[in-house]
Structures are given as structure tokens and as C-alpha cells.
Amino acid sequence: MSLSNLSSSNSNGAFLDYGEFRSGVYIQTSNQILYFTDENGNKVGYQWKGLLPHTTTTNDPSTDGGISDTAWCSIVGSGFIEKLSKEGIDLSWKAHLPTVEVSYNLPHKSLKIWEEGTNSTDNDYWLYPGDGTVWNGIGVLGDIPDAPFKQIVPQNNVIEWSAIATEGQNQFTVPYEFTNISVFINGLLQNKSTGGYVVNGSTVTLNGSLKAGDDIHVVISNIPIKNINYITDVELSQPDAAQKIGLLHGGNIQNLQNFLSFDMFNIDKTGSTDVTSQINNIFSLANQLNIPIKQHDGTYLVSGSTIFTINTDCDLSGVTILPSSNFTGYFLYTQNEQPTTYNSSSSLVTLINSATINANDSILYGLINDTTLDGNAIFMKGNDPLYVARGTTKNWWCNTRISNRGKMDDYLKYGVSGINEVISLPISKKVTTIKLPNWDFINQPANNGVIRFNNISRYRIHGGSVFNRPLNDINKDPVIISINYAYDIILQDFYDEYPSWPLVGGSIAYAYTINFNYINRVTFKDINSQGYGWGIVGGQLATNITYLRCNINRVDMHDPFMGYLKILDCDLGYYGVSATGMGDMYIERTTFNIDDLAFNGWREVDGIINTRPDFGGWFDGGVYIKDITIIGDASKFREINNRGVSLFSAYSYNATLSYIPNGSPVEPWGFKEIIVNGLRCTKPITGKRFSSLVYAASVQNVDYFPRHVKFNNCDFNSSDVECIDLHGWKITPDNSSKTSISNTMNFKSTNFIEFTDCSFVGLEILRPYSSYDYMNLELKLNNCKYIGSNISPISFYTDQVGNYEFTNCDINFISDTTKSTSSLSNRQSSFVINGGQINSVSVPFSILYNSGYSTPVLVNNTIFKGSFSQSSVTSINLNVAEFAQLSNCRFYSNVNNSYISPALWLGSTSNSATSITVMRGNKINTVITNTTTVSGISIKTDIIPFGVASGHINGSFYVDATGTTGTYQLYLNSLNLKSQIGKIVSNGTISGIYLQ
């Protein structure tokens, strides 16, 4: 039967058994047979002769289109089989034995049906009914054919093959295996017995040479049909081969093979046999054929130092790779288009350097008329030093993509005097998909770095995992996945059970699930590596990195990144973020779980979000945060160090080193700008939560304090004031001449801090040591209060010179002396309160610099609440009058629950002087009791709109009777107030002075 008989368009081929007649069968060829059993038990097969396709609707052919020549037509029934039996026609396997004997060229009656338990001799041949194969051997037959029996292949009869000779040809190879051959040259039979030709295998050598165009024709017989038969080898290799198996639109049959699998090569998948070479061969074949690999199950044991290179799509999801203990190899994924390196003497680099390269440029102007690098990712190195990394000076570098004639995707952070190397990586025209296998480290392989991606672009990498990894990796490659020279990459869904604690030479070293170098536009999505270990990600010389929905214990950058670093919707562990940057960092909707009990309080650096201390602790860019959550507390660290961790930390291991070389354009900020929009701390803390919100350890003077720090909508959930410690920061570049700031009004602001809609008990600002006090701080608190178990006002302490402004806040206390160190400000500052409330248990102000006279607290449109009194002179009454300069304020007494004018002095005058200190510009109201009896006349004073002191004070008064105004003299230490008003002389005695 020809294979074409199986075509769906052929109705005269082999019958296909589709079982019992039933509803819902889809008929697309008349070869499909359905069997119907009538009420008498007769089983009849029916073939559909109507229009195709057809779907049955009932269980009976008579009601599903009917039985006719144009509908259902019967072909064979049980009665017909019984008739054949009566005629002596046997339809069992035995009936086929003579035919099979002829086909296999076996002796007549030597072939029998395989029957378990039967003894076999060398002259016996057995037909196995299970699959129709023929076997021969000596022994007892089992339930299925097996050793020592061997399968016998049939012998075909005659095949003809032709070819056209070339000039001088005397040899040709017939593309078949055969036993007998007849050779014809130009139609003449050649005589083998007289030396006309010699046969060696499938090669025929002629006795003499042919001329070009001579006709070669052979007739061969007794061709064995093997597992890989001649149709696959020859017929299906022809351009029209696919048509021979019914694929009318196909070409070469090889085109139909669009992937390779391990199963195709019968590779052991139990993990018990070393299959290193077999897998490597499949990788090589896939690279050669440029087709993907797909395998979704099995465990495969590998060993040795083999590097498995693959440059096509590769889907090994579900596969487990089991490296042996001596395994030092790795899977290397790379693209066909490899990079080109242009050195300083190349014409391309010379062309780039022909134009000036400036900071903020997004065009290499030297390439404005050159297309060499179009559509390439480039990695450039320059002549100028940028920074020092662990004692090594690193020169200028930049990663970007050239779209067309020098146009870069990324602007240059810094300019450079000249380029000395360009590595150009062609960007792939297609997206390559990689699905990683699982790696089982149960054997503790000698190398952990089992996955590497080198020189790749537009790769989408999925899945994969590492498990049974020891917590302590001793003297091993500490990186699982390494990515080098890459552009436009997404790595997602990789699962590492936990990061390890690495030990090298007995000391803690680094260990990472993922490491990358020289990359641009790489995204890590849904990666898991969370636990007690060292780290998850270590990167250097990288540009534009994104972490999305990752559950990892640390994000770590070694060399500073450029462009952006985005951490979005992630869950980070105890180590948080450690990064040096020459770009901006964005952290959004991310949690930090800082519980440290398992680590016994050990931290590499103090902060949750840190700069790299081994690179000098600088970060020449901003950090922008939105909606982050701090979970738990570093309680062991707090116990050992008697302080909490910091939120932001810029710290250098060695303050004596110069981490920024002379002439470098890098500015050593400890974060240039910090903007936090949304911070929530879930665990209540007794005391202050952070040692400092922004911190530089010790007095290092290596990095600048951020120019701008802003906290919006933050809840610190602690019971003591939070702190910003200014110790240890380098002298601000805005006062590089070290001008002594004696008065905040006499110098521009150098640094800006702002809190809006924040909840904390209070805030403390600790100034640098006096010899480094060159900052002029501008700090604003807007709508801040403490929202804990109840709403309460906040306290503010500072010894740092600055302009401090509080708008719509609830304030308890303001002091120019720090709470934690009792350090008094040594410079003049200013304090302004706009709106809001001042609600104090005791006095609200303690301004001690220069006795407070030169540092007024300007209070506008504010409500004062507290133990204010109009009937007695209280300390809070006097404190507000002395330190605050008031405008449109009101006083509410929580003693009698009413608005009042606080009393500053009550009583009667005497010859003794009474001293009252009132801030210049405050309004006071003096009440005078009339001592002269004049009918219809009472005496009152107007508000005295200036400060009160012992001595003469000018003012005015009026009498109710006439409204006449006159001048008077007031002596607060005199007995009477006297004045001449027209013709009436009035006398009065001061009985009270009140703050308005």
C-alpha cells in the first residue's frame, strides 16, 4: 500500500476502523469505517459515500442519512466472515505466513506464529503478532521478543537508479544498500566477472573512465528495508519528497523537522547514566541545523568540564540537569551574530573622536555620516578616569544603542576627551526564547556557575530553578547565572531556593544567583531568591536595569550603574539595596523585610538603602521612592549597637582613599537627591526607628549630603523622635570656600529637607562637628503630626543653623538644642510657624542661642492650646510672649476650655520695678483702673504695638465721654498714670497686662 493511500482525499485506500456507529463522529474520508450491530446481533461495517466532510447525528446509519450508494454503504459483516470461514479461508495470522516468507525470502513453512514458551532453533522464524515483526534465534520464546532473538528485515526485489557521468569519472556510489547489482553504461551491460567493475559496499568502480554525459544505469535487488530505510535516505531528500507522503505543499522532508529533542536520540533520562556527550552533540546539531531544542521531562547526569553551547531557541522546561561532583562545565547561550571590537587605531574610533564628545550629548557627531554601527548595541571605553573601584582606577565608559548615524538611545552622563575602544554587538533580527532547565545540586558540583549568557540581544529567558544547594558554598564559583555583553534581555521566573553563605579560604565572600557585566536594557521579572544567604544580584558596568515583582534578598551593584535602576513591586530581604550610581534609582511598591535574628545582627553596611562602601559610598544621581513598606526590625543589630539601622546610608570603607580621581566629572554625592513618596513601617518600635534617616558613618567627609531630601506621606511608627544626622558629610559644594555661616539670613541655603503629611513623634537635626559647620539648611514640615494610638503633636530639635518652617503642623515643642546630645546651636537660625496648632503640655519653645533675643519664632495664624491662663501668670504664657512673634494667633485654655488673652502681669503698681520680657513686635493689652470719679467717664488704653521694657513708653488713650485722644507717659514702675485731656484730669492705676 502506498503512503499516499492515507491521504484524506483518497477514498480507495486502506480502511480505517473508527469503532462503533455513534453520534458526533467527524467523517473526512470514505476510508473511515463505523460498525453497526442490528437487533439480531449482526455487526456490519459502513462506509460514507455522501458529501464530505460529514458528522454523524445518530447511532444508526438508517437514520443518519440512510443506507444507499450515496449515503451509508455496507462493506463487510459478521455473516460475511462466517461465509469465508465455511469456504476454508482463514483470516488469522497464519493465513499471512506464506506471503511473509516470500517477502523475507525465507524457506517455505519455516515461519511460525510467536507463542510464549515455545523452543526455537536456528532454523525457526517467528512472526510476532504484536507488531508484525519477524524474529530468529535459539532459546525459549518469551512474552515479547527480546535477547537472544534478533529481528529479521525483509528483502525487497528490484530498484533502478540512474546518473549522468562527468568527464573522466570512473566511480559512483549508489544511494542504497543491496546484495545484487547490474550496471549499464549507455545501455550496455557491464560484465563484472571479467573485471568490468568492482563493488565495494555501495560504491562501484569501473574499469576505465567515462566521458561527460555518459548514461549510468543500475538495477539492484535484495535491498534490505531497515529502520532508517531508503525512502528516508533518498526519496525524501528530493525537493518533491514531501508530496510523497501527502504533504502537497511541502519541499524537502528535512523542512518538516523544526526541533530536536533528547527523546529523538534515546538519551537516558533517569539520571543514572552520564549523558554529557550525547547532550552536547544535540546542542551542536541544533546549532548546525539552526532549529530549536525542545525537551520537557527527564533527569540528565552531566560531568566534567564540557561547555554546552547553544545559539538557537532552547526549551528545556521540565528537564532536570544533574551535575556530578566533578562538574565544572556550564550551559553557554549565545547568538550567532558575534561582537566586533574596534580599538583606538581603527578608522571607526578615529572617526568618533573627530568630534567633541560632551556631557548630555545623545549623538556621536563623528558618526553623523557613518552607518557602521547602525542597529548595534555598543560598549564604549574612554581615556578619562571616572572613579576608583577597590583600588583600581576605572576610566570613562558608556553602554548604549546606535539607531542611525551616531544617534544614541541614551544621553551621555559625562563627556570624555576621547574613545579608545568600541565593542559592537549586532542586535538580533528575531527574539530568541530560552526556557531554562532545573538544576539539582545534590552532588555538590565543583562549579556553581552553570548558566552563562554571553553576547546576546533580544533574548527572552524563562523559568529554571536551582535546588539542593548547600547553604555554605566553599571555594566555588559563587554565581549561578552570569550575563555578559547583552542588550534588550528579559529574564523571568527563575527560582533559587535560597542564596548561599559563601566561604573562600574560611572567610565570607560574595555569592549571587545572578551576575551581569556590560549590559543595557535588562529586565528581571518574578525572580525568587530569598533567604539567609549573601545576595541575589551583583552587577557592574550596567545601564538601564529593571527588577519587577522579584522576591530577592538583595539588589547589589558593584561598579556604578548608568541610566536607571528600577525596583518595582518587589520583596527585598535583610540586605536591601547596595548600589553605586551614575544615574537615577526608582523604588516603587516594594517591601523590605529587615529581620536579622538569623544573622546575629551582622551587616555589611548600616542602611536599608545603601551606597557601595568599597567604591567610596558616593551616588551621583537621585533616588526616587514611592510606596515602600518596612517589615520587622533589625532587632539584633539594635541590641548589639544600641541603635537602629539607617534608612539611607552613604558610607566609605576607607575615608583616606581618593575614590574620585582629580579631573573626574563625577560628583561625590551620597545620593544627590532623595524623594520618598509613601513609607509605611508595620512594626511599632519603642524609641526611634532609624539611627538616622540619611546617614554617613563616622567623620569621613567623603560624600556630600544630598542637596534635596523630601519625605511625603510617611509613617515611621516609633515612640521617639527620628533623626537626620549631619555628621560625617563632606563640605557642601555650595560652600566650597568654607564661608563661616554666622547667621542663616546672611548666606544662601545649601541643602533642602522637606516633610509633608508625615507621622512621627518628632524630628531631630544633628549638625556636623563645629570645624565642618558650613551648611545652611532649609527645612520645611507640612501637615505633620503623630498618628499612633492617638493623634498628638510633634517635637523638633536642632543645633544646625538653618531656616525652619512649619506649616499646618501640630507642634508640641521647638528647641535649638538637640535632644540626644544636648548640643546647643552655635549659629543664628530662623523659625516660622504658619497655621496649624501648638499644643504643649509645658512650654512650647526653648530658643537658647544668644538668649533667644536674635532668634524669634514667627508664628502666623496659629492656634495655641495648653495651660494658658487669663487669671494667673503661667510659665507657658510668659514662654510664648518671650520667644514667639505672633500675628493673628489665638489662645485656647484647656483649663477653662475657652479662648483667652494670656496674662503676663497682674496686680497693683508699687514703687518696685517689675520686668516682663516680650518679643519685639508682639501686641499687648494693658488694663488701667480709673481712680478719678468723673461721671460717665472710664479710662482704657489702646494696644501698645511694640515691646515693653522699663522706662518711658508712648501710647494713646481715650475717654468714653468725648472720645478725645491725647498723649501720655507710662511708667511701669510708677504708681499712677496721669494725663491732661482737655479740661478734665483723669487718674488711673495699671491692673493687668495681657498678650494679644
Curated annotation (Swiss-Prot):
- Answer whether the UniProt record assigns the keyword Repressor to this protein: no
Q: Give GO cellular component annotations, separated by semicolons.
A: virion component
**Keywords tagged on the record:** Degradation of host capsule during virus entry, Degradation of host cell envelope components during virus entry, Host-virus interaction, Viral attachment to host adhesion receptor, Viral attachment to host cell, Virion, Virus entry into host cell
Q: Name one GO biological process term.
A: symbiont entry into host cell via disruption of host cell glycocalyx
Location in or out of the cell:
Virion
Function, as annotated, reads:
Functions as a receptor binding protein (RBP) and probably mediates the attachment to the host capsular exopolysaccharides. Displays a depolymerase activity that specifically degrades the K64-type polysaccharides of Klebsiella pneumoniae capsule.
What is the name of the protein in this document? Depolymerase, capsule K64-specific
Organism lineage reads as: Viruses, Duplodnaviria, Heunggongvirae, Uroviricota, Caudoviricetes
What gene name is given for the protein in this entry? Answer: S2-5
